Amino acid sequence: MLEPEYLEKFSDQLLALVDALSTAIIADMSKRLVKTGEITETSRRQAEILQGAGLLYKDVLKRVSQVSGYMNTEVERVFEEAGVRNLKNEAVIYKAAGEKEIKLHQSETMQKILAANVRKTKEEINNLTLTTAVKTQSAYITACNKAMMKVQTGAFSYDKAIADAIKEAAVQGTEVLYPSGHVDKLDVAVRRAVLTGVNQSAAEMNLQYVKESGCDHVETTAHSGARPTHAVWQGKVFCVSGKDSRYPPFYESTGYGTGAGLCGWNCRHNFHAFFPGISTPAYSQEMLDDYSARKYEYNSKKYTEYELSQMQRSQERKIRATKRKLTGYDAGIKNTDSNTLKAELTNRFESESAELKKQEKSLKKFCRQTGRRYESARTQVHAVLDSEGNIVGFNKSVAQKAVWASKRHTSKMQMVKQLDKLSDEERLAVQRYTGFAAHRVNRALYSGKSQMIEKEREYMKVLDSALDKGVIERKIVVHRDTIPEFLNVFPKGFKYSEHDMERLVGKTLTNIGYTSTSFRDIQYGGRNVHLEIEVPKGYRGCLYIESLAIKKYKNQQEVLFKRGFRCKIKNIEKENDRYYIKAEAIL
């Protein structure tokens, strides 16, 4: 006998592998989408889409082949574990009745039952995963055509259309196609296949045990939230042969052997041996009634255990959907050559990261209030990739990238609110800075010529007043690209060698002009020094000015610091003729 609680969770590790496969497929689709390029003449465009779809089909087949071995190993493991557990549970009942115990590894018959069900389930899962290639290819073509239509009608820009296509593909997720034409999510299909396979394997073992021992009665397990057609027979004793009139016949009453009956599709009920006169029923009528009682309170309403479980599953599905979107956006960011598309995807990534944080917080609160367990087994597994992007293993990890993006998004929203403090004159000064004023005013400051500086004094007074109203409410990290000569830590004309650059560690950088930074690494061409600056909570004198920037520079996500900005260099590394400096702003 396998307990309903065990059957609810035993496949989590396998489903984590499925989630990783889905993630890889979505990333592959996103890569193809961002490489489609601008909209071209229609017939040529269709040819490009079909070519991309063909390549994606091969991508998916490759991904499936990379993961199938791990999935097969996990299927074998869960079947073995469940088989041993099932017979151990049965042994307790048989020993109490004076019957001998049967162990899995000592029974050739039991091993054959297990092996047959393992083989059947592996074949079913393999066939289902292969159909994802067809469904993914179809989803890609649909997404491309929708994007093309949006751009051609003038309703959307190219960047927004592609970003929408990535979102739609990710939300749809990886799907499987059954021979009947029915379509399901890959994780749902795999869970159904392995749950049904493991449960039927245990049931066949139990009936074999009954046959060998001469026992003619079984008791079904019970759980809250059983479907109505199953609730009528759960937790009751039946006669297997149907010859004992004191008990209802097993097959006719439970529908065992049919998809809709006991141990059928997605069923978590099982059964165990029962010896009349010796065994004690596991479930009283009071216990069965309690399973359907509305005894759990949440937000001032009463719910059954089943209703709460469905509410939790719903929230978990939303979290997985958000993570799929993050995967799509992240892959697009890494693979696009378009700065505007990268900016659009980055903004969406940060927004979805914040949404993920809210969803996870809501789920944890729900579990805490209802006394349910917060499940994280599926959320902690990710694929390990080699240098060519092939899946070569699996590991456990927290999605740190999404965590940091969420924090960055929150910081940006807090800083946006600070712009409300600015006067109209100050807002105009900031906007002018993002245009031509930046070059003019900084040139005056760097020149040191009093006449040039005096000419800009009134403007700088207003700009300084605006920047003084900006205060960092939580630690942020900003980026700045420059060249060695602009670091202002060695005398003018000093030749910067690699050794000299390493000597910068521990030194303080001071910029006498205004300092433009960004929430993201823009990687300006011709600038071989990248500064990553940590700005502590409480720092005063900077504003996040994206919403005030002129259109040309809105995608830079600029954080502007007032003149005299100082930071201390903590670390410096060189990679491919580019220097990466980590620094900390000085309060």
Give short role names for the model-derived ranges.
Residues 167-169, 182-185, 207-212, 218-221, ...:
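A general structural signal for short secondary-structure junctions and capping/turn motifs
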Residues 1-21, 75, 79, 190-193, ...:
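Short, Φ-rich (hydrophobic/aromatic) sequence segments
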Residues 402-587:
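Mono-ADP-ribosyltransferase
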